[in-house]
């Protein structure tokens, strides 16, 4: 029987030591252990008597035999509990052994106040426990229900709830900021790519069998502008030169075909042909090209100011070209042939008339524009006012 109620009984055989030491040591006081006496009587006033050893078992097993005198009230024996009280909780795992031989009632095993009080009637013992003061030792199962929920009460405290809400808000805000940054970066990269596609005129870069895949690429900066000069590979320049010799002006359809074949953009092909035409003009110093042995004039873009310039040219008065020497000789011969028709009555001599004829010819060719009109009267000799004639 390994109970703390039995171990003190064997103390007289082993020098006051228990047979099976445990974490706790419940013993009777020295006075009780030496004399093995039990005090009976109301309030402990009755005289004590020696209790034989063979009646000890009867004392503990109260239901079968023993002293059951209702006139006397059993004084509870004082038990000195030694050992750590926190380790007493481990005793719950050990198998319980009832003091009465059979498990009639678990409430009769009185652990709370570590006092052995046996009475003939179980009701009296229960009432006696209620009358006593609160026990000095409190075990986990004896504590009130509210003390075990200190952690729960702390969790549901207002301060803890506020801190938890603040932490949740901070976490949500950080996640939202991260997602927003990712979305903005993706949006910026998408707009940048769309801008590059628009600059390249939507032409797809395809690599053919004869094309050099390491062709020059467009180097663009952050603002989308091209940095540096565009370089072309040997194969690309050769094909472009062939196409230029065949036709210096490309249609849009042919330009797209060439750009796909050479892995270039439509804009690059267009600029290359423009530069090549300007270079050809500078080398040959001409304004026309020869294509397939034919004379091909360069195209002129119709502008709004062309019609206005043509109208102004029509309104301008064309300047008369200076007459050549052949025309002067022809006029002299013609005037000599009509010499008979001129009036000679007012002239004094033949020599004078010849001089007059010569002067009229000179005045007709070298006078001002208003005097060239034949209806005007030409004054031949101002000294001789009478010598006037009319040119027909």
Swiss-Prot record:
Keywords: Developmental protein, DNA-binding, Homeobox, Nucleus, Transcription, Transcription regulation. Residues 297-321 have a biased composition (Basic residues). Pfam families: Homeodomain. GO terms for molecular function: DNA-binding transcription factor activity, RNA polymerase II-specific; RNA polymerase II transcription regulatory region sequence-specific DNA binding. The keyword Transcription applies. It is found in: Nucleus. Its main location: nucleus. Disulfide bonds: none annotated. This is Homeobox protein Hox-C8a.
């Amino acid at each position: 029987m390994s109970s703390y109620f039995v171990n003190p009984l064997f103390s007289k055989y082993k020098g006051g030591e228990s047979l099976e030491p445990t974490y706790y040591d419940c013993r009777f006081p020295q006075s009780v252990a030496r004399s093995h006496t039990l005090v009976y009587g109301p309030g402990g006033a009755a005289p004590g008597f020696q209790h034989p050893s063979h009646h000890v078992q009867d004392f503990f097993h109260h239901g079968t035999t023993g002293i059951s005198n209702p006139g006397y009230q059993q004084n509870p024996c004082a038990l000195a509990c030694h050992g750590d009280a926190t380790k007493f909780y481990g005793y719950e795992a050990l198998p319980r052994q009832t003091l009465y031989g059979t498990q009639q009632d678990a409430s009769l095993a009185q652990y709370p106040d570590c006092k052995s009080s046996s009475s003939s009637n179980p009701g009296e013992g229960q009432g006696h426990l209620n009358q006593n003061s609160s026990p000095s030792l409190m075990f986990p199962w004896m504590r009130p229900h509210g003390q075990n929920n200190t952690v729960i009460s702390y969790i549901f405290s207002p301060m803890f709830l506020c801190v938890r809400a603040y932490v949740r808000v901070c976490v949500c805000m950080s996640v939202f900021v991260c997602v927003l940054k990712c979305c903005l970066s993706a949006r910026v990269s998408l707009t940048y790519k769309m801008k590059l596609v628009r600059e390249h005129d939507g032409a797809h870069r395809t690599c053919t069998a004869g094309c050099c895949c390491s062709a020059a690429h467009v180097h663009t900066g952050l603002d989308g502008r091209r940095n540096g000069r565009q370089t072309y590979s040997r194969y690309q320049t050769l094909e472009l030169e062939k196409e230029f010799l065949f036709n210096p002006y490309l249609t849009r359809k042919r330009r797209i075909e060439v750009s796909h074949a050479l892995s270039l953009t439509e804009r690059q092909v267009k600029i290359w042909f423009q530069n090549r035409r300007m270079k050809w003009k500078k080398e040959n110093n001409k304004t026309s090209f020869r294509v397939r042995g034919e004379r091909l004039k360069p195209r002129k873009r119709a502008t709004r100011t062309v019609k206005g310039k043509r109208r102004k040219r029509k309104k301008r008065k064309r300047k008369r070209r200076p007459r050549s020497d052949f025309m002067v000789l022809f006029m002299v011969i013609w005037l000599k042939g009509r010499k008979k028709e001129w009036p000679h009555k007012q002239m004094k001599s033949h020599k004078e008339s010849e001089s007059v004829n010569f002067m009229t010819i000179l005045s007709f060719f070298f006078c001002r524009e208003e005097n060239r009109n034949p209806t005007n009267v030409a004054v031949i000799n101002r000294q001789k006012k009478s010598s006037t004639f009319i040119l027909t």
